[in-house]
């Protein structure tokens, strides 16, 4: 690893109302970049790694310093361009243009492989941005908690008469994304057993209350799960072991969980999945000395992992891929039926996407948790009839530990995002909150991603791999005036398997911000409704009609004026 990717430095975003940059529109991306590297947020901040294997916030430390310098000097009518974590230009635009435009890890399709990307990365020519790492809107594990919670709740509705009480979830991975699983299961009323091969990750999740207990052995873990499910308690248990060993052992013992999934970093076999029988230090060393052999060893272990998941599915246990591309990796190693169990989006989430419902998130730039609690109350006031959402907000306040700048996520759709954004902007204007708020989302949203093994798996019209949609989403958010816009490749599922876009907008209390919010927070989720209506989903067409969208090739939306 080049020396410039390592620095023993602790970074935390500024708090309060004193600006380092020239305006809140440039202070916001500066603080969010720094927040991504806060040691309470990032998995490996000294190497600029935020989450998801090698998902970085900047290409190297020289690039980080240059980005910070550029943002502090950026004028109100200038736009900073970021190419794979490197600041490459500042251009005159206008005051309603994005202040930052980001493109991360995009490769011409024929060369969009981990092997080619790793060559570029080693030469200092590329950076893996994951989804929200390189787009500076990661908020820690909370960012995926509600999506995982909604998935588990829907699984309970489909398979267990609406409740997961007395049930248990078997999964693996306690990294930046997977770390949400045990808390999400608990909030959904289920016990969980999560396998994680790094003790440091278990320690972090115990400290932040995302996991309740650690078992010493597999027998100990199963005894705890048996006791808690019998008592009807929702308790999360972690076990330090390798999932490629534990899941086959559970199959051999005839153990029957109630749900099975996985959120290891299987998308990145070189950095994210420990081969069976290896120590983590050995894995890291071999990744440098023998990358091909290391990737093959990891994929062989993934194949064993997926065979066990297939065995659970054959037992009748609801089993699903949670978007890390482990099925694809197993298929490449000869597991021809790896896709016999579904991904979580077609199984549980797509009806939400049809209505533009997805991971709406916001961050208090003040650093004051009270600002988030006040916005929680505002959400309840505006979305007054959604008791399920109110329940989520109550649980989040009680159980979710803020990482870095205080933040909140809640899944809302096209009908509500603009209204909430305008309300937050008004709260800033009249001083109800102490500093501006940024609103963003995961790239995992209804109109912002093409990922045939995850978000766009099994589309009704067969358009799973069509990536025009995230490109259009990024272009429209740029035209609408988002504060920063990002376009990435490979997030979630790895090189060659996804393209996706993100946006962030600042609520600074001004009339100009309100105008931008009206455009961005309507148009962004509307692209998701558009994408699903175009694919033939009746629920999306109904939403398009209700919300007055003009979709020229969708007849139901025409002739209204």
UniProtKB/Swiss-Prot annotation:
SUPFAM superfamilies, alphabetized: Urocanase
Main location: cytoplasm
Residues holding NAD(+): 52-53, 130, 176-178, 196, 201, 242-243, 263-267, 273-274, 322, 492
Gene Ontology terms, MF aspect: urocanate hydratase activity
Active site: 410
Coiled-coil ranges (or none): none
Cofactor remark: Binds 1 NAD(+) per subunit.
Cell compartment(s), UniProt: Cytoplasm
GO cellular component terms given for this protein: cytoplasm
InterPro entries, sorted: Urocanase, Urocanase-like, Urocanase_C, Urocanase_central_sf, Urocanase_CS, Urocanase_N, Urocanase_Rossmann-like, Urocanase_sf
Origin superkingdom: Bacteria
E.C. code: 4.2.1.49
Cofactor(s) listed: NAD(+)
Keyword hit for NAD: yes
Reactions catalysed according to its record: 4-imidazolone-5-propanoate = trans-urocanate + H2O
Keywords associated with the record: Cytoplasm, Histidine metabolism, Lyase, NAD
GO biological process terms, semicolon-separated: L-histidine catabolic process to glutamate and formamide; L-histidine catabolic process to glutamate and formate
NCBIfam families associated with the record: hutU, PRK05414.1
Described function: Catalyzes the conversion of urocanate to 4-imidazolone-5-propionate.
Family: Belongs to the urocanase family.
Protein name in the entry: Urocanate hydratase
Protein source organism: Salmonella enteritidis PT4 (strain P125109)
């Amino acid at each position: 690893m080049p020396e410039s990717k390592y620095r023993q430095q602790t970074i935390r975003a500024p708090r309060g109302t004193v600006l380092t940059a020239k305006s809140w529109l440039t202070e916001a991306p500066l603080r969010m970049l720094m927040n991504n590297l806060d040691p309470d947020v990032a998995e490996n901040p000294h190497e600029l790694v935020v989450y998801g294997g090698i998902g970085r916030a900047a290409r190297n430390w020289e690039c980080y310093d240059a980005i910070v310098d550029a943002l502090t000097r950026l004028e109100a009518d200038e736009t900073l361009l970021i190419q794979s974590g490197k600041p490459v230009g500042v251009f005159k635009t206008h005051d309603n243009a994005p202040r930052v435009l980001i493109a991360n890890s995009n490769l011409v399709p024929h060369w969009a492989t981990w092997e080619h990307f790793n060559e570029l990365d080693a030469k200092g020519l590329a950076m893996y941005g994951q989804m929200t790492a390189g787009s500076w809107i990661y908020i820690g594990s909370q960012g995926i908690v509600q999506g995982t919670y909604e998935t588990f709740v829907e699984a309970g509705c489909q398979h267990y008469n609406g409740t997961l009480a007395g049930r248990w979830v078997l999964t693996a991975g306690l990294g930046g994304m997977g770390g949400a699983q045990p808390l999400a299961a608990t909030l959904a009323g289920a016990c969980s057993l999560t396998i994680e091969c790094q003790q440091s990750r278990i320690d972090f999740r115990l400290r932040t209350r995302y996991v309740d207990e650690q078992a010493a052995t597999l027998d100990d873990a199963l005894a705890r799960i048996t006791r808690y499910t019998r008592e009807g308690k929702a308790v999360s248990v972690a076990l330090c072991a390798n999932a490629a060993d534990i899941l086959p052992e559970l199959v051999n013992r005839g153990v029957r969980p109630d749900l099975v999934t996985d959120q290891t970093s299987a998308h990145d076999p070189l950095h994210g999945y420990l081969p069976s029988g290896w120590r983590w230090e050995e894995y890291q060393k071999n990744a440098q000395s023998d990358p091909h052999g290391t990737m093959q060893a990891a994929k062989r272990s993934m194949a064993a992992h997926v065979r066990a998941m297939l065995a659970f599915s054959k037992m009748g246990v609801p089993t699903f891929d949670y978007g890390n591309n482990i099925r694809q990796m197993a298929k490449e190693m000869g597991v021809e039926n790896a896709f016999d169990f579904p991904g979580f989006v077609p199984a549980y989430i797509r009806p939400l996407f049809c209505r533009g419902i997805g991971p709406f998130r916001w961050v208090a730039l003040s650093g004051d948790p009270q600002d988030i609690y006040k916005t929680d109350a505002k959400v309840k006031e505006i979305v007054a009839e959604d008791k399920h959402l109110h329940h989520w907000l109550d649980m989040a306040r009680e159980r979710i530990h803020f990482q870095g700048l205080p933040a909140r996520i809640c899944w809302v759709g096209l009908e509500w995002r603009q209204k909430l954004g305008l309300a937050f902007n008004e709260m800033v204007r009249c001083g109800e909150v102490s500093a501006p708020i940024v609103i963003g989302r995961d790239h995992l949203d209804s109109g912002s991603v093409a990922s045939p093994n995850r978000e766009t798996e099994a589309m009704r019209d067969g358009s799973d791999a069509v990536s025009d949609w995230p490109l259009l989403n990024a272009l429209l958010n740029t035209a609408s005036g988002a504060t920063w816009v990002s376009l990435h490749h490979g997030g979630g599922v790895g090189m060659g398997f996804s393209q996706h876009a993100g946006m962030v907008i600042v609520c600074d209390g001004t009339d100009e911000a309100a105008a931008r919010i009206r455009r961005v927070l309507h148009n962004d989720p509307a692209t998701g409704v558009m994408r699903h209506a175009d694919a033939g989903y009746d629920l999306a067409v109904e939403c398009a009609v209700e919300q007055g969208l003009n979709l020229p090739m969708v007849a139901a939306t025409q002739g209204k004026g």
